Amino acid sequence: MRQKLEELLTAIQSPDRSLAIVAQAHLDDLTKPKGSLGCLEEIALSYVVATGRIKPVLERKKICCFAGDHGVAAEGVSAFPPEVTPQMVYNMLNGGAAINVLARHAGAELSVVDVGVNHDFPDLPGLLRRKVRYGSRNMSLEPAMSENETIHALMVGAELARDAALAGFHLLGTGEMGIANTTPAAALFAVLLDIPVETITGRGTGIDDARLNHKIAVIRKAIKVNEASLSTPLGTLAALGGYEIAAIAGFVLGASVCRVPVVIDGFISTAGAVAAMFLSPAVADYLFFSHLSGEQGHRIVMEKLARKPILDLDLRLGEGTGGALAMRIIEASVNVYNEMQTFSSAGVSGKTEE
């Protein structure tokens, strides 16, 4: 299993940054004052560099929502019971969740991926059954996943990204569903980005002060219990992560091999992206962070990564909802880049020199 991961990581290459010079010159020649479209120009330039195409294409979009259960839910860190995970998966498959609405209006295909739900799903349209295990272990007592299970989940995500690239999708998005998954996400941020546990840990699905303090204590205990496993990114992901978080990390890795940009959703998806960045720093150039999550600590994570999320709407749902919204902004940015006239082609006079 480890050899498969090494081969995947070796295949990831940094994009050609020289394309940024050509793309910036094109943006500056569009019929507008330089920089007047603000972040749209930055997004378009990043998309050109990531895809390696000076004439970028963005027509087909796909979101994969990865689902998994967490053993640490037994510690009472969430306001909702674990059985909500499969219930919400069924809701998504029936078209009733927020991500269904937002993905549809973004023109994005949606797949729900079972990588670790503690439930047996029948064959259903829109569901990809890729179960690694029936939920992770309780990370406050032992490692959440074994190394082989972690690599298995990573490869599930990577293979789905490659399949999407081969099917002709131009932009991918991440989503997740898993009761208690803000707990492993916060633990991963605390260790990988060296953020104090009390700073990074938030209220998740809306827990009160007493349960928040308990959640902080559980995360501290998990870090202490698994201390011997935290010397490497893979060991940290295995000890403190979850199957859907590992699959998101793999999704990022696989997409980066194929030079397909990925829109990262919120707090939990960012944990998967950060794990991928620690496994292969080159993936950073293929990522768009969709929004600043309402979950406590996400702003600090973005500052640590020196990244600016596209949207700030106080979203804290997950599922890929922020990613679906941001896809429309990215598409608008690419359309501006491709479809606006240039000063030279339109016969419009440029800015006069004073």
UniProtKB/Swiss-Prot annotation:
PANTHER family: NICOTINATE-NUCLEOTIDE--DIMETHYLBENZIMIDAZOLE PHOSPHORIBOSYLTRANSFERASE. Gene3D superfamilies: 1.10.1610.10, 3.40.50.10210. Keywords: Cobalamin biosynthesis, Glycosyltransferase, Transferase. This is Nicotinate-nucleotide--dimethylbenzimidazole phosphoribosyltransferase. It comes from Chlorobium phaeobacteroides (strain DSM 266 / SMG 266 / 2430). Catalyzes the synthesis of alpha-ribazole-5'-phosphate from nicotinate mononucleotide (NAMN) and 5,6-dimethylbenzimidazole (DMB). It holds the Pfam family DBI_PRT. Its EC number is 2.4.2.21. It catalyses: 5,6-dimethylbenzimidazole + nicotinate beta-D-ribonucleotide = alpha-ribazole 5'-phosphate + nicotinate + H(+).
